[in-house]
């Protein structure tokens, strides 16, 4: 290598400088510990610089003070020397001349009134400044601090006061400590109170900052409006109304009677669902409510629990008032849903001494009249059958103060609107809101004002008009999105049009062993239900059927077999799509697509209930183009749904069918 090669060129130097500048300008990542260390070093450096400046100022002050002192001493010495020199010079003259001069001056001052000259006192420069530096030997408090206790030091300022003011913290600590000592020497109740005071003092000493603690870990008194908003967001709760209570965090904070808490523990209700968290506090305040919630959300317990608590505060049913009818009426669109509500209601009613009776079609009037004669606190009925019983005078609703309409949208779709209006109009206390406000004022002032509750999966205009007619200032409660399927359900759509291909696909799904009983298969036509059930029985599955042509006894037996796991598969029409609660349904198979997206939503809502996951498989064909658009929109909103390309790209999936027909 030559000497010229070892010497870098100008371009290399410029390149190296550019690289260094880029490297210096590039931000350097520092960890949290390094940032803390650098901040601490900067702080220490600032403190040291401040101390150095203070020491320099102090040293300069001392130097200037010492210099002034020396100057004053030198000036005083010069004055003394001048006086001595003048005296000595006078002495060197003749004593007679000095005496004569002094004598003549004295005579002039005496007879002529001449005042003697005033000699101005010269002020020293050192007197203008105050030195704040004290010597250590000047400190007189050391002996007092070592010889006297803090209590004695404070006591010298008066009767328990410090400088004329009470030391509140010391006085409170003394009083609390004395109280705790006295309580610890008392009874067991006093000792418990003492331990509470000790815990309270420990909490105050800790001074926990609850702002950064999640709402689940906070005590109830530490909850702030922000925490309640987060709770509502976590459970998809949207509520509108006046003077609304906060949702429930758990059963223990709900303020329920101890007997009800025991029942909840017995039926294994560990935590309230979303609608139970929001609806129960509202209903306990005797407010009217419109609840819009997804299927399988626990609506039944949401109104049964407050209903039973309210009934427990009314006079007990005896022979003197039993003929006046029940205290509460629950309306359901189908027999199966009514009987299911009765079963769920008796879980809470029977342990507390109340009776819940169902009045549905398929049973003799005499049988239901006998049940009512025994006394019933709650009646669960279908609108048609209840209206027949009222018209036949089998029982009355003279003391009914609670009305619940479950699946209100389904009741109106099934043509029960007139029956519902007649039933509500026949009740003793009307909640119909009139413009003059007289009924409203009377209802609010009366202790027997009727409380009306309406639950629905959707809110069509007819349901809104019904609520407007019979509910007073209702609270509007929405859980999730209206008309949305449960997020725990995995939705799959398969494009199959031929019945033979559908059946082969059913066999493949069942033989995959991915889904365990119970399983529900929905079919649109009743004549196809029995054929599919026979084919299922032929390949080794125990299938039962449910449709409108079945008697009430056959319906109840089919559902009971599926619940008891004596049957594996239920083949049904949309009659089983709403309100039927069969636990642990792993698969809902839509052999035929539902005629509306609402019915589809309720069908797949039979699985994924009570916090568990489920699967819904739908066979889609060309005859279902009317629901392509709504189905595509519904599937696109779910994170657990798969949309096949045939559906996504189909022309009918981009325009709503109602818009085309118009």
Swiss-Prot record:
CDD domains: DEADc_DDX23 (cd17945), SF2_C_DEAD (cd18787). GO terms for cellular component: catalytic step 2 spliceosome; cytoplasm; nucleus; U5 snRNP. SMART domains: DEXDc (SM00487), HELICc (SM00490). Residues 70-101 are annotated as: Disordered. A motif (DEAD box) lies at residues 406-409. GO terms for molecular function: ATP binding; ATP hydrolysis activity; mRNA binding; RNA helicase activity. ATP binds at residues 293-300. InterPro entries: DEAD/DEAH_box_helicase_dom, Helicase_ATP-bd, Helicase_C-like, P-loop_NTPase, RNA-helicase_DEAD-box_CS, RNA_helicase_DEAD_Q_motif. Keywords: ATP-binding, Cytoplasm, Helicase, Hydrolase, mRNA processing, mRNA splicing, Nucleotide-binding, Nucleus. Residues 280-477 form the Helicase ATP-binding domain. It catalyses: ATP + H2O = ADP + phosphate + H(+). It comes from the Eukaryota. Its main location: cytoplasm. One of its GO terms (biological process) is cis assembly of pre-catalytic spliceosome. A motif (Q motif) lies at residues 249-277. It is found in: Cytoplasm; Nucleus. Residues 83-97 have a biased composition (Low complexity). Residues 488-651 form the Helicase C-terminal domain. Its EC number is 3.6.4.13. ATP-dependent RNA helicase involved in mRNA splicing. May destabilize the U1/5'-splice site duplex to permit an effective competition for the 5'-splice site by the U6 snRNA, resulting in the switch between U1 and U6 at the 5'-splice site. May also act to unwind the U4/U6 base-pairing interaction in the U4/U6/U5 snRNP, facilitating the first covalent step of splicing. Belongs to the DEAD box helicase family. DDX23/PRP28 subfamily. The Q motif is unique to and characteristic of the DEAD box family of RNA helicases and controls ATP binding and hydrolysis. Component of the U5 snRNP complex. This is Pre-mRNA-splicing ATP-dependent RNA helicase prp28. It comes from Schizosaccharomyces pombe (strain 972 / ATCC 24843) (Fission yeast).
């Amino acid at each position: 290598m030559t000497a010229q090669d070892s010497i870098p060129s100008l371009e290399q130097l410029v390149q190296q400088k550019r690289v260094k500048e880029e490297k210096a300008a590039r931000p350097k990542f520092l960890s949290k510990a390094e940032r803390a260390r650098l901040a601490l070093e900067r702080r220490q450096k600032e403190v040291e610089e401040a101390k150095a400046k203070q020491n320099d100022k102090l040293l300069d002050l001392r130097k200037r003070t010492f210099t002034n002192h020396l100057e004053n001493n030198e000036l005083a010495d010069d004055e003394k020397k001048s006086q001595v020199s003048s005296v000595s010079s006078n002495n060197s003259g003749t004593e007679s001349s000095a005496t004569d001069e002094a004598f003549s001056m004295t005579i002039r001052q005496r007879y002529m009134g001449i005042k003697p000259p005033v000699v101005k006192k010269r002020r020293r420069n050192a007197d203008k400044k105050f030195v704040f530096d004290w010597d250590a030997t000047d400190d007189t408090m050391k002996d007092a601090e070592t010889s006297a206790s803090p209590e004695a030091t404070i006591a010298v300022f008066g009767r328990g006061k410090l400088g004329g003011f009470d030391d509140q913290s010391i006085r409170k600590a003394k009083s609390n400590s004395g109280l705790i000592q006295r309580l610890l020497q008392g009874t067991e109740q006093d000792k418990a109170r003492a331990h509470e005071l000790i815990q309270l003092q420990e909490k105050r000493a800790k001074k926990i900052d609850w702002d950064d603690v999640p709402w689940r870990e906070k005590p109830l008194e530490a909850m702030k409006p922000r925490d309640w908003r987060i709770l509502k967001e976590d459970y998809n709760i949207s509520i509108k109304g006046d003077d609304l209570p906060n949702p429930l965090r758990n059963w223990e904070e709900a303020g329920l009677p101890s007997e009800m808490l025991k029942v909840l523990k017995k039926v294994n209700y560990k935590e309230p669902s979303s609608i139970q968290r929001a609806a129960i506090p509202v209903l306990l305040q005797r407010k009217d409510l419109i609840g819009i919630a997804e299927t399988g959300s626990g609506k039944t317990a949401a109104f049964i629990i407050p209903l039973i608590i309210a009934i427990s505060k009314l006079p007990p049913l005896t022979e003197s008032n039993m003929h006046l009818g029940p205290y509460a009426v629950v309306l359901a669109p189908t027999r199966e849903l009514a009987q299911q509500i009765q079963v769920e209601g008796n879980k809470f009613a029977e342990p507390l001494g109340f009776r819940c009776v169902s009045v549905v079609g398929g049973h003799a009037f005499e049988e239901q009249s006998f049940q009512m004669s025994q006394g019933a606190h709650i009646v669960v009925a279908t609108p048609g059958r209840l209206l027949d019983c009222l018209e036949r005078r089998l029982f009355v609703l003279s003391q009914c103060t609670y009305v619940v309409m479950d699946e209100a949208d389904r009741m109106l779709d099934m043509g029960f609107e007139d029956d519902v209006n007649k039933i509500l109009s026949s009740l003793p206390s009307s909640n119909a809101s009139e413009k003059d406000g007289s009924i409203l004022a009377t209802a609010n002032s009366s202790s027997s004002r009727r409380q009306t509750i309406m639950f629905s999966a959707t809110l069509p205009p007819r349901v809104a008009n019904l609520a407007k007619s019979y509910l007073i200032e209702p609270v509007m409660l929405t859980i999730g999105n209206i008309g949305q399927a449960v997020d725990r359900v995995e939705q799959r759509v398969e494009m199959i049009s031929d019945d033979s291909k559908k059946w082969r696909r059913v066999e493949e799904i069942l033989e995959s062993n991915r889904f365990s009983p119970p399983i529900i298969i929905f079919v649109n036509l009743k004549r196809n239900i029995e054929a599919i059930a026979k084919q299922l029985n032929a390949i080794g599955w125990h299938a039962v059927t449910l449709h409108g042509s079945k008697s009430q006894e056959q319906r109840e037996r089919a559902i009971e077999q599926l619940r008891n796991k004596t049957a594996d598969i239920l083949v049904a029409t949309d009659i089983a799509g709403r309100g039927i609660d069969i636990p642990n349904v792993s698969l809902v198979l839509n052999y035929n697509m539902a005629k509306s997206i609402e019915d589809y939503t309720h069908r797949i809502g039979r699985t994924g209930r009570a916090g568990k996951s489920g699967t819904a498989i739908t066979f889609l064909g060309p005859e279902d183009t009317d629901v392509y658009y709504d189905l595509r929109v519904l599937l696109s909103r779910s994170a657990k749904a798969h949309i096949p390309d045939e559906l996504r790209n189909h022309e009918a999936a981009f325009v709503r069918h109602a818009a085309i027909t118009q």
